[in-house]
Amino acid sequence: NIEIKILDSKHVKNLIDLIKRCYGMTYFYKNFYCENYIKNMIDSNIIKAVIAVNSNNKIIGHITLFKNEIIGNVGLIGATDKCFLGEPAMLMIDPNYRKKGIANRLIRYLLNNLNLFDKNLKGLFCPPISKHVYSQLLMYKNGFKDCGCLICYYPKVNLSHLNNNNQRTSLLLTYLPINMKSVKTIYLPPLYKDIIIYIFNNKN
C-alpha cells in the first residue's frame, strides 16, 4: 500500500535519500542535498512537501509546493511585493515505483489540499524543463496550460535518467488558475495583441 501525506521535517534525511536514488548527485537544486536547508525551508513555511511512502514507511515519491515567495526557476530576484502564486516542483519517483500512477496521486493530493498550504493562492505555475516530457504531460493531465517558454534559459542540465546533450535547457511555463474572483482590465500593446490573446485563450 502507498500512502500520500505531508512530509514532517523530522524525516528530511529520507527525502534526501530519495533524491540520491533518483538523480545521484546530479540534481540541479543542490541545496536540497543539505538536511538543515530543507528543514529551515519547511519550518519557515516557504515550502510544503508531499510524499508517498510504502508499507515500510520508506519515501518513494515526492512533490514540493513553493509558496508565497517569488522563488524558483522564473522568479524575480529582489522583488518586494507579496506573491500569491505557488510552484509545484521537485516531482520525483523512486525508480522501482515508476509507472504506477504515484506521480499523479501526489499532484492530486496537492491540488485537493491547497488550503492546508496557503488559503490566499491565486494560481499555480510550473516551469518544467523541455527535455522532461513526462512532467509536461502530467501537468496537462491536471489542468495546467502552456502560457510561455523561456528558450535556452538554463545552461545545459545533466540528469542521470535523461538523454543529455550540449544544448542549453529551455523551460515551458504552465499555469493553473485557482482563484478567479477578481477581474482586472489589461490594455494590450497592439504589436503583441494577437499572440497575447492566443496564449490567454489557451489557458482559459
What are the roles of these predicted feature ranges?
Residues 89-100, 128-130:
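A short, internal acetyl-CoA/4′-phosphopantetheine-binding micro-motif in the GNAT/acyltransferase core
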Residues 1, 154-192:
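C-terminal "cap" of GNAT-fold acetyltransferases
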Residues 12, 16-95:
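A conserved beta-strand-loop-helix scaffold within acyl/acetyltransferase catalytic domains
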Residues 2-15:
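A short beta-loop-alpha structural element at the N-terminal edge
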Residues 97, 101-109:
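Conserved acetyl-CoA pyrophosphate-binding loop and the N-cap/start of the following alpha-helix
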